[in-house]
Amino acid sequence: MKLMWLLFLCVLAFSIAQIYINDTCAGGVHRCYEPCEKKKCRLPHKCINGRCTCYVGRNVCAISSH
């Protein structure tokens, strides 16, 4: 029973990821071709937990307006 609660809490923690559309991604993003520090993710990419969602062969980072 304790294992089931632990598994439930782990799934819950992963499912509460903060998703922001076209938000700044600071904090050492290494999944993009160029880091998205002080830049924004281009649409339709999203910023999930400080990282832009990235696809192979696409530049997802844009210069931030602030």
UniProtKB/Swiss-Prot annotation:
It comes from Lychas mucronatus. Keywords: Disulfide bond, Secreted, Signal. This is Potassium channel toxin alpha-KTx 27.2. Has the structural arrangement of an alpha-helix connected to antiparallel beta-sheets by disulfide bonds (CS-alpha/beta). The keyword Disulfide bond applies. Contains 4 disulfide bonds. Residues 1-17 form the signal peptide. InterPro entries: Scorpion_toxin-like_sf. Gene3D superfamilies: Knottin, scorpion toxin-like. Belongs to the short scorpion toxin superfamily. Potassium channel inhibitor family. Alpha-KTx 27 subfamily. It comes from the Eukaryota. The keyword Iron does not apply. GO terms for cellular component: extracellular region. Expressed by the venom gland. It is found in: Secreted.
